[in-house]
Every structure is written in structure tokens, then in C-alpha cells.
């Protein structure tokens, strides 16, 4: 796997998808020493299960452990810290990590109980987990989801779980963006495998999951987050820590130089009906046998339009899904390759939310 590769797979079987990504990554070429220490860093920000859209699916963690152990790697740890005020141990319990640890003989490291090393980048000094700093190969397992303060969280921000609680508080005092970039300049992931199966629409605690049935992998955390932002309909300027991390040499945000490798096509599993805060967005759509990946991107695009008071400009429902294949109707508007016969249509399988936003804005400008 090259530094500019982004490998994507679609489906609903997290374990199978993870194995497909690992096969494509060729992890043995990245970690030739079978005695290397490997840390898995999921997102367990709060003690809720993955169906909430907040936390990493444990099936992904299990699949990685089994894959690595099958290749002869034995020195594996799961390392995480819940946010300030919540219990990592409860997050481990709720999501079955205690049993995972026992079954696979993989230690759980609660960063809240770890020792720390002070690291300084610029004028920002932080306390970083000794376990994370000493590991030979760090696999970051973030959830791509919305965030109430930084708009989005993925690879770069998930590293905040490697800090002491004191440093987490300090990060919020400093406004998050500069500290997040600085943290990744101290230690960023060697490999990122993103859980983008059903991340929350706009809140890191979950509660409004949007099913997209997608996972992707990258070596460059900055490129990973740049791609994730485009999937959720954000411009880079909306998430300052991405370009701040780039300026510190963490990686590149230039998606034009990314090598996108799609392992399979999105499946035709019917997407879940939006609930909660996302339900009003679904009222602007007309799905017919839509794939979750495509429909989820549309929901994110509509959310971005709503945030800038442009949702009201959409006068006709947006068609989406395989049910529109072969249909020719000059009066309808659609997104995705399946709607190419409609009067106005955006191609792509699936199109990214950022492209949907531009298309929908152009309709009404």
C-alpha cells in the first residue's frame, strides 16, 4: 500500500470488509518484523455500542486481531481512552472488549491509567500515552462521524484518545484545531482503517447514525481526513485541523494526488430510513432501491445545505437508487449513476457528498 492510496470497500459485514482491506493493504510489507509491537486504537469516546454511530464496531477489531495473529504477529494491544468524565473500562465492557481480550489474549490498555510523556510542538505541550509512543506500529480505527465542535472527526481527531485527561481539557481550552494538528505531529497513525458504516450525522456521542455501509483505509491521516470530509460534504476550510496538520508535515490534503482503489461496488441493500435529526432531511429525497453508501452521502449533503440555509431552495425531491435505471423523465432530478436518464443528474457510484452539494446548489443558482 502506497502513501497516497485510499482503499474503499462497501458492504454490511464489518469482519469480511476488514479482511478485504487487510488483504489489499499487504500489511506484512509494512510490518516485516513479526515481533513488532502493534497498537489498535478504536474510538470508544463514550460507553455506547456501535449501532449508535459513535463507536468503532468491535467486529473490525476482532477481524484485525485474527488476521494479524494468523500472520504470526503476537505483540498486539488495544489502546483507548474515553472522553473526560466517561469510563474507558465501561466502554470496553459495553462493547465486548473484555471477552475479546480474553479470547485472543490481547491486553486492554486504558490510557487514563497509563503513564505519559510530555511532548511539545510549537507552544503546545501535551501528555501523550507512553504505550502509544513506544508502539512500533499504530493502527488507528476511527469512526467517520460528525462533531459538534470540529464539524467532523476521523483519523486526526481520534488520536486525542492517546492523551491524559488533563491534556484533553487543555486541548478544548486552546480550541482543538491547533492542538489536534500538533498531537499528530508528535505521533500519527501508521495505518488508518475507517469505520464508515453508520457514523453519526453531526454529534460525536451518537444518536443519529447514518448508514453508509462503507469502510476505507489509508496510510496518510491527513489525506484520510480530507477524503472523509469530502464524503460528508465538508470543504477543507470547514475543518481547520486538517490543513494545520498538513502544514506541520503530517501528510497531504491533496485529493487530486490520491489513488482511490475501490474493491467492490456498493451493494443494493436498502438503506435504513433516517431517524431523529436526520428524518427531516429524508423528506427531500425519493429513494428507490438506493444503496446505503449513495443515500447516506445524500443525507450528509442535505445536512450541509441545511446548515447554510439552502435546504429550502430544493423545490423538487431528489431521486436516488437503482429503481431509476432506464427511466427517462425530463422533469426529475437525481444523483448517482442510476439516475442518468433523468432531466438533471449527477453521476458517480456513489457520488461524494461534496459533489452533490455543488450539483444541488447549481440547480437553484
Language-model features and meaning:
Residues 1-365:
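N-terminal and secondary-structure boundary signal
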Amino acid at each position: 500500500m502506497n502513501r497516497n492510496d485510499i482503499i474503499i470497500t462497501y458492504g454490511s459485514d464489518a469482519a469480511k470488509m476488514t479482511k478485504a482491506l487487510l488483504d489489499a493493504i499487504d500489511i506484512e510489507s509494512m510490518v516485516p518484523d513479526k515481533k513488532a509491537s502493534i497498537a489498535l486504537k478504536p474510538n470508544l469516546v463514550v460507553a455506547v455500542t456501535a449501532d449508535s454511530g459513535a463507536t468503532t464496531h468491535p467486529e473490525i477489531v476482532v477481524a484485525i486481531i485474527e488476521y494479524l495473529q494468523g500472520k504470526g504477529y503476537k505483540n498486539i494491544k488495544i489502546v483507548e481512552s474515553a472522553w473526560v468524565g466517561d469510563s474507558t473500562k465501561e466502554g470496553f465492557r459495553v462493547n465486548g472488549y473484555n471477552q475479546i481480550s480474553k479470547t485472543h489474549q490481547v491486553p486492554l490498555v486504558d490510557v487514563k491509567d497509563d503513564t505519559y510523556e510530555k511532548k511539545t510542538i510549537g507552544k503546545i505541550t501535551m501528555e501523550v500515552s507512553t504505550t502509544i509512543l513506544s508502539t512500533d506500529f499504530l493502527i488507528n480505527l476511527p469512526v467517520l462521524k460528525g462533531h459538534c465542535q470540529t464539524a467532523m472527526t476521523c483519523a486526526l481527531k481520534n488520536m486525542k484518545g492517546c492523551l491524559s485527561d488533563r491534556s484533553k481539557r487543555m486541548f478544548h481550552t486552546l480550541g482543538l484545531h491547533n492542538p489536534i494538528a500538533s498531537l499528530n505531529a508528535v505521533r500519527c497513525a501508521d495505518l488508518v482503517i475507517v469505520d464508515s458504516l453508520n457514523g453519526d450525522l453531526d454529534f460525536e456521542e451518537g444518536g443519529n447514525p447514518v448508514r453508509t455501509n462503507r469502510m476505507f483505509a489509508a496510510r496518510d491521516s491527513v489525506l484520510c481526513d480530507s477524503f472523509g470530509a469530502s464524503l460528508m460534504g465538508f470543504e477543507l476550510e470547514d475543518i481547520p485541523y486538517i490543513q494545520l496538520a498538513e502544514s506541520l508535515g503530517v501528510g497531504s490534503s491533496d485529493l487530486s494526488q490520491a489513488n482511490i482503489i475501490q474493491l467492490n461496488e456498493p451493494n443494493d441493500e436498502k438503506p435504513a430510513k433516517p431517524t431523529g435529526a436526520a428524518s427531516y432531511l429524508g423528506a427531500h429525497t425519493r429513494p428507490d432501491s438506493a444503496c446505503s453508501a449513495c443515500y447516506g452521502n445524500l443525507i450528509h449533503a442535505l445536512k450541509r445545505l441545511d446548515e447554510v440555509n439552502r435546504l429550502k431552495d430544493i423545490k423538487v425531491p431528489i431521486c436516488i437508487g437503482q429503481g431509476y435505471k432506464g427511466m427517462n423523465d425530463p422533469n426529475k432530478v437525481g444523483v448517482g449513476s442510476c439516475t442518468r436518464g433523468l432531466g438533471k443528474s449527477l453521476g458517480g457510484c456513489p457520488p461524494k457528498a461534496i459533489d452533490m452539494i455543488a450539483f444541488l446548489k447549481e440547480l437553484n443558482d
